[in-house]
Amino acid sequence: MNVKKAAAVFSITIPIISAILIINFFTGFMSIPWQGMPVFFPLLLSPIGIILAFVSIKTNKRCAVYGIVLNAIMFPFPFFWFIGGALLFGV
């Protein structure tokens, strides 16, 4: 596996792992020591996933497009979560 194919795979796995951590945060299935960090992770990891997808766009266009779309969907989630929490709960 060359570097660009690995970048395409990682650009897809980053939002999947972020989504799994967020679902775990909501459901409390497994106890993790990071209180609110799973909600904050997409803000840090999604730009990395988008960059990896752009790097791999010439070798595997389909995976790169999926990576860009999934990371673009996950990126604004923390903003919606924090703004929604402030509007609904006043915190």
Swiss-Prot record:
Its main location: membrane. The keyword Transmembrane applies. The chain crosses the membrane at residues 6-26, 37-57, 68-88. GO terms for cellular component: plasma membrane. Keywords: Cell membrane, Membrane, Transmembrane, Transmembrane helix. It is a multi-pass membrane protein. It is found in: Cell membrane. It comes from Bacillus subtilis (strain 168). The lineage of its organism: Bacteria, Bacillati, Bacillota, Bacilli, Bacillales. This is Uncharacterized protein YnaG. The keyword Cell membrane applies.
